Every structure is written in C-alpha cells, then in structure tokens.
C-alpha cells in the first residue's frame, strides 16, 4: 500500500512540473501564409515560420537566406508585442529591420492586434500589414 501511495505522489509531482501555455491559442508553431500590406499588395509567403512559447518568439525562413531570429514576445488583451530580435547562434548580433521585412515586421518593436485566433488559424494586424497564419 505504501508503494502505491508513493507512486501516486511521484506521478502527481512529475505532472505538475509542466509549463502551461501563457499565450493561449497563440502558443505553438505557425506558418505565415500571407502578408497583406496597407497599400493593397498581397505577398504569398513560402516556408516562413513563427514559433511562440512563453515570452519568446522564433522566426525562421526555411530554404532561403532569411535565417532564424529569436525575440521577446508579449501577449496582453488582444495585442502582441515582438521585439529585441537577435540572430540564432549569434545572440550578440541584433537583427536589422531589413532582415525582419520578409516576416511581415517593419520595426524594432512591433505591435500587432490579434484580430482572430483559433487553434488552427490566426490573423494579426500592424500599422503596415495584416499577417495570416496557419497552425503547423
């Protein structure tokens, strides 16, 4: 009986150590599908991914020369803030604004309004573009 009780306590202890998602339906890996600019131009995206977990966002362009960048992520109310992007593997090197453009980001500190977020799709809008994502 004592062994069963210890086993149950051990299992409860292990399961309580998991980090719960703090960003709701935004947490996870997302593929950027389109960037709709305010001037009417629509850009179809090819192999651009956002990975969101806790207070970090990783953006990466696979198969191109966009590289991978890691930044700070904050989600409050219906607003997302992404900032302080650095090159993955060389954290001393800040990401330039030109390097952020293929990801639909145009500022060092990006504020986006979450228009809609389900478990499968999300739409975010900034002052320059509307980003459409699908869960990956």
Where are these regions (language model features)?
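Exposed, flexible binding/inhibitory loops of compact, secreted disulfide-stabilized domains
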Residues: 27, 33, 44-52, 71
């Amino acid at each position: 009986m004592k062994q069963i009780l210890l086993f149950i306590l051990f299992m409860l202890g292990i399961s309580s150590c998991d980090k719960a998602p703090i960003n709701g339906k935004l947490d996870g890996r997302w593929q950027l599908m389109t960037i709709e600019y305010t001037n009417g131009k629509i850009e179809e995206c090819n192999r651009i991914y956002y990975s969101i977990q806790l207070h970090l966002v990783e953006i990466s362009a696979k198969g191109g020369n966009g590289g991978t960048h890691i930044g700070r992520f904050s989600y409050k109310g219906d607003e997302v803030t992404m900032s302080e992007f650095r090159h993955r593997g060389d954290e001393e090197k800040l990401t330039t604004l030109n390097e952020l453009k293929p990801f639909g980001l145009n500022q060092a500190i990006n504020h986006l309004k979450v228009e809609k977020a389900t478990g499968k799709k999300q739409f975010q809008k900034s002052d320059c573009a509307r980003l459409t994502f699908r869960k990956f």
